[in-house]
Amino acid sequence: MSSEFLAELHWEDGFAIPVANEENKLLEDQLSKLKDERASLQDELREYEERINSMTSHFKNVKQELSITQSLCKARERETESEEHFKAIAQRELGRVKDEIQRLENEMASILEKKSDKENGIFKATQKLDGLKCQMNWDQQALEAWLEESAHKDSDALTLQKYAQQDDNKIRALTLQLERLTLECNQKRKILDNELTETISAQLELDKAAQDFRKIHNERQELIKQWENTIEQMQKRDGDIDNCALELARIKQETREKENLVKEKIKFLESEIGNNTEFEKRISVADRKLLKCRTAYQDHETSRIQLKGELDSLKATVNRTSSDLEALRKNISKIKKDIHEETARLQKTKNHNEIIQTKLKEITEKTMSVEEKATNLEDMLKEEEKDVKEVDVQLNLIKGVLFKKAQELQTETMKEKAVLSEIEGTRSSLKHLNHQLQKLDFETLKQQEIMYSQDFHIQQVERRMSRLKGEINSEEKQALEAKIVELRKSLEEKKSTCGLLETQIKKLHNDLYFIKKAHSKNSDEKQSLMTKINELNLFIDRSEKELDKAKGFKQDLMIEDNLLKLEVKRTREMLHSKAEEVLSLEKRKQQLYTAMEERTEEIKVHKTMLASQIRYVDQERENISTEFRERLSKIEKLKNRYEILTVVMLPPEGEEEKTQAYYVIKAAQEKEELQREGDCLDAKINKAEKEIYALENTLQVLNSCNNNYKQSFKKVTPSSDEYELKIQLEEQKRAVDEKYRYKQRQIRELQEDIQSMENTLDVIEHLANNVKEKLSEKQAYSFQLSKETEEQKPKLERVTKQCAKLTKEIRLLKDTKDETMEEQDIKLREMKQFHKVIDEMLVDIIEENTEIRIILQTYFQQSGLELPTASTKGSRQSSRSPSHTSLSARSSRSTSTSTSQSSIKVLELKFPASSSLVGSPSRPSSASSSSSNVKSKKSSK
């Protein structure tokens, strides 16, 4: 720096460099300090500016957040308002729906009443008609007899004819009226059905609207939640931004510090460059060491080979030790067996000895005398002792052998453990060595591969060189020619095989075409069967739904029953509470009487106590007055004594006389003390007087209470308040009794209602059980049908195949591709039979459920068809047996049935879910389902 400055000044080298004096040095120091302060102040200024910027950005974010929260609050308020609005709408709608339901119920009730009235009228009219018909028959007979008897009375005959005509007219009018009423009834039913459908549709619309509203509400909630989440995220981000701003300021500070460090590091770098040269030298030394390591590696490789040899020898030793161990185990097992045999033999000998002893005893007892017995026994004992000693010796020997063997076994087990541990160690070392071997083998293989590739490359280069030179061997030529011949032969063979394969492929294509056709037929059949199965499943589902409805109805009845029970319980509780109130009032009356008696006794006791207290207070007052008098007399005495003392206590001559002030002070002190005592006594007197006054007041109160109590025992006059209260209480009691009787009547009625409800519940349960039984029967029947359909599938396939073959043969014979007249005739008969079956089914349904007749009639009229009646059923039943066989034969032809079904006009019958249809099983709602059921029945037959 100084050299540059001197160069700018054109300072010559010969002259000495100028040095600043002390003042300039101080100025330079001050300047450097000021520069440092300036730099620090600039840094602080930058920091403050950055803080201001961050604060302004934070303020903006806060403002934005505030606006967002306000908007969110407004949205919440709007949501609450909308919810309240919707709630109010829903409540109004609910009220309207309730009114509508009530109106409909009233209308239903009125319609039912009208219906019952009409039915009664029809019944009466029919009864009258029957009576008139009977009269007509009787009148006709009488008329004929009378005409035979008197033919000459023409005028009477004319009158009779007139009456008969009048009767006929009446009958016709009644029949017309009956028909008109039935039509009106049908119309009313139609109107009722329409109303039902309208209500159901309105209900569905309402449900849909409610669902839509719920969806919208949920979406709105989700939006608000998303909004809240976004706000939270924004807040988090704002916090992150603030943190980042702080971090940025900190980083900037760090960068400044690091810049200073960098300057220092540059100098350090220059020094490190010098060090690097030294390290390069060291690296060269390390390379030399690496060469040495490689040589060492080769040495290790040789040692590895040696270790491998040692490992093999160790393996051999391990195998040898394992075989020795096995032999030892076998020996131990043999020794154990020998010991077991020896112990068994010893036991046998002991048993044998015992048997011999018993025998000896028996023999000696029988034959020998006492002395002989004794001598024999002694001999036997000696022999036995000898035997026992011998056995003991043998046992000791065996024990010694066993002990030795056990020790040997322990040593062998210890050896085995040691050998096993050695084996484990050798195994682990083996694994390690094997791993190293694998690594080395892998490296050698790599090296060999490289070698082979290099050799192959060299050979290829040599061949290319020879070819370039034009050198080809005769052997190579011959080999190439032989290869060409072989390739030609293989080409011809492949051509022939290719031709064969093409022919086979054509055949396979044909087979595939036929298989596809068969598969399509099978799929159609499968689809038809699946539709049948689906229809059966629908039937089962409907029956299950009806069962669920029955269960729901049962549950409603149970709920009503429980509600009634609750009402009964409530009434009982009310009754009990009223009874308890009556009892409590009576108890209260008795308690009042007892309390009055107790109170009188207490008042007497209190009187006596007060009298004694008054006496005690009078005595105290007399005592205090006596004390007061005594004290006054004492004061007089003290005064006299004082005068005497003053005379006595006059000082003798020569002594100083006590001053008058002394005696005045002393007297004042004594006076004050006396005054205090007097004040205390006055206070006590005042207190006693007050107590006396209070006692007098209590005495007056007691006297007034006693007077009232005495008056209460007097007879009550009609003009008094007590008499009026008594009358009121009696009236209340009468009202309570009447309520009690009314409640009892209500309870009886409720019990009767409960009984009737229980009876109806039993009936409903019985109906539900019947429905369940029917459902189980239907399920079993459906399962049977599905089984039968599965069984009929192969037959159907066979029949369809036969039919297809026959139709093909017939068409080939007639040289036509279109349908023949016979086929059309068969289809027509099938159609007729199908219609007959459907008609029979409809007639059966109408017979089972008379209410469905009107619905079916309306649907048939809409589609321009006539409803089948029961009169046609008989004729159809008579013709069913011959046509049944033809139908079962024709039902196997799936192709013809599928075409015939396509031409049928489908009637969609939608029945109302009324309670009258609970008992009857639900029918399929389309002609296709009924046809499938009929077919399945026919196939099962």
From Swiss-Prot:
GO terms for cellular component: axoneme; cilium; cytosol; extracellular region. Residues 868-941 are annotated as: Disordered. Mainly expressed in nasal brushings and, to a lesser extent, in lungs and testis. The keyword Phosphoprotein applies. The keyword Transport does not apply. Residues 871-903, 914-934 have a biased composition (Low complexity). The modification Phosphoserine is found at residues 892, 900. It is found in: Cytoplasm, Cytoskeleton, Cilium axoneme. It comes from the Eukaryota. Residues 16-122, 164-273, 306-605, 665-825 form a coiled coil. Pfam families: CCDC39. InterPro entries: CCDC39. Keywords: Cell projection, Ciliopathy, Cilium, Coiled coil, Cytoplasm, Cytoskeleton, Kartagener syndrome, Phosphoprotein, Primary ciliary dyskinesia. GO terms for biological process: axonemal dynein complex assembly; central nervous system myelination; cerebral cortex development; cerebrospinal fluid circulation; cilium movement; cilium-dependent cell motility; determination of digestive tract left/right asymmetry; determination of liver left/right asymmetry. Disulfide bonds: none annotated. It is linked to Ciliary dyskinesia, primary, 14: A disorder characterized by abnormalities of motile cilia. Respiratory infections leading to chronic inflammation and bronchiectasis are recurrent, due to defects in the respiratory cilia; reduced fertility is often observed in male patients due to abnormalities of sperm tails. Half of the patients exhibit randomization of left-right body asymmetry and situs inversus, due to dysfunction of monocilia at the embryonic node. Primary ciliary dyskinesia associated with situs inversus is referred to as Kartagener syndrome. Required for assembly of dynein regulatory complex (DRC) and inner dynein arm (IDA) complexes, which are responsible for ciliary beat regulation, thereby playing a central role in motility in cilia and flagella. Probably acts together with CCDC40 to form a molecular ruler that determines the 96 nanometer (nm) repeat length and arrangements of components in cilia and flagella. Not required for outer dynein arm complexes assembly. Belongs to the CCDC39 family. PANTHER family: COILED-COIL DOMAIN-CONTAINING PROTEIN 39 (PTHR18962:SF0). This is Coiled-coil domain-containing protein 39. It comes from Homo sapiens (Human).
